Regions:
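Bacterial N-terminal signal peptides that target proteins for export
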Residues: 1-9
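Bacterial N-terminal signal peptides
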Residues: 8-18
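HIT superfamily nucleotide-processing domains
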Residues: 20-260
Length: 260
């Protein structure tokens, strides 16, 4: 028992040190260190600290953690398998978990949503290699900014199922494209593959992609929509990251808490 406590304490120290380097952008590997420390602490003590949650139900290669990013109180999901980012081939291999579905479910539970169902408040963002600060895949969880929500709602009536369509500037100075999925079941969708296929002949590297999952109303029913943009897109002034699209806390939402 004492040995487990000592190792758990050591894992916490490692995680807090990694948090510090991450917070000050000193090391692009810091998030991976935090993930490993959370997993180690969870295995030894049953507590996910300093993460909010550790899920290893399918084993470490299929698991994920949920945690706050330093300072900004940004909530993210990060896999417990080493995955560099949106460009990682594993995400399109057919063997990867549906991290977007996991993130949507977790964020919905945090904010009084409807579990896996579409919710027009929520959105998930994976940054491109140009805008991310860490070389471990992580999904930013939040609510769309009011301006982004209005832009998506205005574009929705023009979207056709299964077709990527330009929707203009979802945020200032950055054009986006949208794919109406025709589905209200995110577990049946593969946003990473859909974005990769949609932009395969348009960009030189998938590392340039920013991928977003949101929802919109079509014919009175909500469906999931996959949005994407890329660094160097025509008329883009600078690459857009999650901080331009998301509110870190949803209005009137309860304080985030995840039970084990």
């Amino acid at each position: 028992m004492r040995r487990s406590w000592v190792f758990g304490f050591a894992a916490c120290v490692v995680a807090l040190t990694a948090f510090a380097t991450w917070a000050f952008a000193l090391d692009r590997r810091a998030l991976w260190s935090v993930v490993n420390a959370c997993v180690a602490d969870y295995k030894l003590t049953g507590a996910p600290f300093p993460c909010l949650k550790v899920n290893l139900a399918g084993g470490k290669d299929q698991g994920y953690v949920i945690l706050y990013a330093p300072f900004v109180r940004d909530t993210i999901l990060a896999p417990t398998r080493k995955i560099v980012g949106v460009e990682d081939p594993f995400l399109r291999s057919g063997a990867a978990p549906n991290y977007f579905a996991d993130a949507w479910r977790a964020w919905s539970n945090l904010n009084g949503g409807r579990g896996e169902s579409p919710d027009r408040r929520f959105a998930l963002v994976v940054n491109s290699a140009v805008t991310r600060s860490q070389d471990q895949l992580h999904i930013h969880m939040g609510c769309l900014t009011p301006s982004a929500r209005r832009a998506l709602d205005a574009a929705a009536p023009k979207l056709a199922v299964g077709q990527w369509s330009a929707i203009g500037l979802l945020v200032p100075h950055q054009p986006f494209w949208a794919l109406r999925t025709g589905s209200a079941d995110l577990a049946r969708l593969d946003p990473f593959r859909l974005a990769a296929e949609g932009f395969a002949g348009r960009i030189r590297s998938l590392a340039l992609l920013t991928v977003v999952v949101a929802s919109a109303r079509f014919d009175g029913a909500d469906e999931f929509v996959v949005l994407a943009s890329y660094a160097g897109a025509p008329h883009a002034w600078w690459p857009v990251g999650a901080e331009n699209l998301l509110l870190a806390r949803c209005p009137s939402a309860p304080r985030p808490y995840l039970s084990q």
